[in-house]
Amino acid sequence: MGRLVVKREDYMATKASAIGHASVKKRIRKMFGNIHEVVDMPNLIEVQRDSYENFLRSRPEDGYVSGLEKTLRSVFPIRDFGGVAELDFVQYELEEPKFDVDECRQRGITYAAPMRVTLRLIVFEVDPDTETRSVLDIKEQDVYMGDMPLMTRNGTFFINGTERVIVSQMHRSPGVLFDHDKGKTHSSGKFLFAARVIPYRGSWLDFEFDAKDIVNVRIDRKRKLPVTTLLYALGLNAEQILHHFYNTITFVRGDGGWKVPYVAESWRGRKPFFDIINGDTGEVVFPAGQKISPRAANKAGRDGLETLLIPTEEIYGHYAAYDVIDESTGRIWIEAGDEVTPENLELLDNAGVATLELLDIDHVSTGPWIRNTLKADKAEDRDHALAEIYRVMRPGEPPTKETAEALFYGLFFDPERYDLSAVGRVKLNMRLDLDCPDTVTTLRAEDILAVVKTLVDLKDGKGEVDDIDNLGNRRVRSVGELLENQYRVGLLRMERAVKERMSSVDVSTVMPNDLINAKPAVAAVREFFGSSQLSQFMDQTNPLSEVTHKRRVSALGPGGLTRERAGFEVRDVHPTHYGRICPIETPEGPNIGLINSLATFSRINKYGFIETPYRKVVDHKVTNEVIYLSAMEESRYTVAQANAELDAEGHFVEELVSAREAGEFLMAPREQITLMDVSPKQLVSVAASLIPFLENDDANRALMGSNMQRQAVSLVRAEAPFVGTGMEETVARDSGAAISARRAGIVDQVDASRIVIRTTGEIEAGKPGVDIYRLMKFQRSNQSTCINQRPLVSVGDYVNAGDVLADGPSTELGELALGRNVLVAFMPWNGYNYEDSILISERIVKDDVFTSIHIDEFEVMARDTKLGPEDITRDIPNVGEDALRNLDEAGIVYIGAEVQPGDILVGKITPKGESPMTPEEKLLRAIFGEKASDVRDTSLRLPPGVAGTIVDVRVFNRHGVDKDERAMAIEREEIERLTKDREDERAILNRATYAQLQEKLLGQTVAAAPYKHIVKGARIDIETLASVEPHKWFKFAVEDDARQAELEAIKNQYDSADEAIRKRFEDRVEKAQRGDELPPGVLKMVKVFVAVKRKLQPGDKMAGRHGNKGVISRILPAEDMPFLADGTPVDIVLNPLGVPSRMNIGQIFETHLGWAARGLGAKVRTALEEWREANADRYEWDFSPPEVVRERMIEVYGEKYAEDIKSREDREIVEMAGLLRNGVPMATPVFDGAKPEDISEMLNLAGLDDSGQVELYDGRTGEQFDRKVTVGYIYMLKLHHLVDDKIHARSIGPYSLVTQQPLGGKAQFGGQRFGEMEVWALQAYGAAYTLQEMLTVKSDDVVGRTKVYEAIVKGDDTFEAGIPESFNVLVKEMHSLGLNVELKTSKAKDEDDSSFQVAAE
């Protein structure tokens, strides 16, 4: 028996060599950007992940309470109506999900974790006399409350086996908004100001001015009330209301007038009609009719002027601040708010009132709005006001004091019914300058007063109205919050049921389980994930479309806008979008501007506002400290652009710097700058940041470019672009398309379907020391494209955490690769590229450059019918052997079979109802249980338009139904795979553990040994270990106690890891053998996957990244294509007229730079070939170092990359040169990319003409074209609009029930409509018979079309057209209008006349 012994030196050497063979990027992108980014881009899908994580899991260590727990705590405790019992929430726990993600995808079930909630039922004893409660009994129990869907690592959900994304929603932030009607309501055109308090949930409160300048309030958009009614209801009286809004002035009677205190501010710029006299000295300070200058007013104050004497007439028109009452009789001379008139002033004079407190209303800076409202208000005190509010809210019900109180309290002050949320409170505090903790989420009296005060100030011209479209007033609700709201609704429904249950059972005997019925809560969650407008089928066309879908922000959806009602303002780009929402990427069409994409660096803060990062500027020096700001906070700063020039210390070079301040662009002096952008691409979204030379494209075309990249189909061979932007790697990594290493380690095994990595470094207890990555092989995506992953590493490679191990669909070497680089010439060619058509070379089709694989899924179910069970079988009536050639003995198609339209995929027979039976037959049937003997063929056949290869078959059986041979074979295969995994994991675990053991045992003194020949006290060496089987090494005991403890720790870790492997294996085998959960009535389900290879063909849509889209018009043989001087034919010919009017010049820059990249690649290739020739007759270990290649690479990449290239090993240099042969990849980041000078320099370096144009020759004649033509490499994409999916031909298909005309559309197997204009064309040609045929036998003449069919079958070619069915429908419609229309045939003249007479009578 061979023993496993690892020599220590060998072990360490292998470790070192493995680390030496470290992971380095196989290919370098030459970057043109100069701006160094100080902060890493946040993970692109963390928005989704963080939001859901915060919803699901509390973090006790930092005191964070999860959204789920908050929701549960807001509904519990539930008390019964009598107060005898209460059901309280203790904690919740999410268990391990029953199936993992892959199993859920295959079985079509939801990936979710069972949720257990610990509830406590407390029963009280209520003393009937004192009504005190004492606890009688407390019971705790864990209650199962349904499954909570879990998010996958990539930010998606699996609901019923399909991958879905919950899109974030943008809505109006809770808080207060001040606005005006822009003068549209009233004919005079004056602005009517309004304020609205928007809660997170609860009643809306609107304050508004009307045309008469009265301030009104509406609750929940109901009838309006004077605002003072609301203030009375809050407990204020008239005097308090007036005092809150106005200052008072004390008037004291003097000689010949009234004395008032002198306030300089109120006299500046006024022109008095009377002499203004010093109240103390009696001299004239300001003469009548002379304007008082601000300087004179201030001087008078400084000279000691304190009181003025003004004539009595001047006091008229002021308003009293208090009630003036005759103390002795209680008679009111003048009420608070009343106007002072000669009449009531005379009364006051007679009563001897010498001082008056009047309101400071000057009708200039302070208007009498609240005073006027108070006087117009019918209510006079709190009770009146409450009754008035009650009448508005509940019209027709008589108010009592208690119900009115309760209603008013419940509207705004009851946390159960009204919730501003923390966000709303923060917004309220900021707008109204209040200081209230964000835990107070109901309204307070002072909040309402502050809102009214601010509204009145606006009317008086103080302050600004808010901008609704500012991102400071719109917030984002992500998955967690949306689900939390939905779950709360479900829990509240459940609460009602629980309360009713509590009052109907004996609480002392039941357990919490008997009271709770979790169905409403579970249904709410299921409904949210299954059918909410924001839960969408994930766009899986390519990795970019996945990432953008998860980063989408929609203003539509429940509680949001609707397409029809959204105006232009909401959709428009706003200055606050900068760095938060992309101004480019949004759909064309009705949703434009309503569906947006987050910008690259933006993130969402805890209040739901979008933040973007900036670098701080301290003492005029730009630091590397980064702060994230929301739109509200940003308005205080002046922000410089990311491309502002800095010197080595970080100071601005220019005196004036291009900057943004309060939404405006300006040139600001450098001392004024307080922040600076982090990166030029923080402005745009992920898709837009992938467009090179974006800055040279028109915005409309850039929008199309970003949208079309999301529709690019993944091709059979991915190729990264020559001209990229440097974002390709980030997208590939964050989308999860390429597999990244979770932990560092050494690659142990690699094959096409899995990668096994032995982890290095410390392994956490209970975690396996082995990572197995399963690769997806030819799986179907949501869009029927093909998901296929290919390993990039080889055995023995050392990988770091985060390194790319395998490429996925549309990725190459860990970079996003949506299309292919092709050689393009810009020139017209015989009209084949007129109006954006594209002419392509046959080489592209022949070499499968744009070939893609599409996988269709077909499923068939065998159900239990009334007449007996359906059966999946090969034995089908009336079907020849030829039709069954692809089926196995179970009647299911083989994997690898090539199928054509109409071929049987799964044979299935269904029992058929027979002719009526006699009673005797029925009786026999009932006794012997025979089911129907007659069957019909209901097999699954391949629909028209699909032909391909079967790549996968899955059979699902109901629990308890016998499995057929095919199902058994699939199950055996699965178990073999699981066994192999288990054995590999064990082998690696053993290897790693024994190496550890050996390290710890060598050189130790034996205290006990597994075999007698090893004596106590001996030293352990290699020979000792070699004489014992490795699995018995655990039985060694050593004298060193510390070392012995280490050995025991290794043993415990080994045992627990081994146990985990065993358990995982058994669990998976059990799942594979267990029956599947199928829909009710289904016995068996078979899914068949057909792969179709789609080559490029005329009618397919292609596009570049700059919005330059077109349809292929012709595929031309390569020899007819225009060719270069060296004989290379171009791949694609585009029309140059497509560029000027579209203004997407980026494509021309890309062409030139791509041409240079190809030329530089050729230089590297020649160097590599020279080196290979020099070493042609040497062995590998004797090769000369590839210095010539290294030098050439340094020359191509420039000094910036010299260090990196010099530090690489010879082997890596050769490998990298091999990857650069076709072209050197370059990156030109958006807004910081290659300048025209850089492109010229690259072209010169590659030895090409720096005009970017070459002489082309006509492929058909061989003659040179008159002028040079722009030729270069463009990255072209094949879009998901394939002609194969659109074109179809109808033979005999379904007809509409009413009109009997053929249906329309491919899905209904419909015909082409011969419409009004087409009829005109035939009429114009006089083609009467053709037209008659079109309108009758080819359409809806039911009898006629049957006769035509019979005639054709008999070989006869005479037939007659009858009456179209649509004529009959018309007649019936006229009947329904009471018009009798019938067809009469005339036999003779007189008969005809008589019938007319009858009709006339």
From Swiss-Prot:
It is an enzyme of class 2 (transferase). It comes from the Bacteria. Keywords: DNA-directed RNA polymerase, Nucleotidyltransferase, Transcription, Transferase. The keyword Glycoprotein does not apply. SUPFAM superfamilies: beta and beta-prime subunits of DNA dependent RNA-polymerase (SSF64484). PROSITE patterns: RNA_POL_BETA (PS01166). GO terms for biological process: DNA-templated transcription. InterPro entries: DNA-dir_RNA_pol_bsu_external_1, DNA-dir_RNA_pol_su2, DNA-dir_RNAP_su2_dom, DNA-dir_RNAP_su2_hyb_sf, RNA_pol_bsu_bac, RNA_pol_bsu_CS, RNA_pol_bsu_protrusion, RNA_pol_Rpb2_2. Its EC number is 2.7.7.6. It catalyses: RNA(n) + a ribonucleoside 5'-triphosphate = RNA(n+1) + diphosphate. Pfam families: RNA_pol_Rpb2_1, RNA_pol_Rpb2_2, RNA_pol_Rpb2_3, RNA_pol_Rpb2_45, RNA_pol_Rpb2_6, RNA_pol_Rpb2_7. GO terms for molecular function: DNA binding; DNA-directed RNA polymerase activity; ribonucleoside binding. GO terms for cellular component: DNA-directed RNA polymerase complex. CDD domains: RNA_pol_B_RPB2. Belongs to the RNA polymerase beta chain family. The RNAP catalytic core consists of 2 alpha, 1 beta, 1 beta' and 1 omega subunit. When a sigma factor is associated with the core the holoenzyme is formed, which can initiate transcription. DNA-dependent RNA polymerase catalyzes the transcription of DNA into RNA using the four ribonucleoside triphosphates as substrates. This is DNA-directed RNA polymerase subunit beta. It comes from Zymomonas mobilis subsp. mobilis (strain ATCC 31821 / ZM4 / CP4). The lineage of its organism: Bacteria, Pseudomonadati, Pseudomonadota, Alphaproteobacteria, Sphingomonadales.
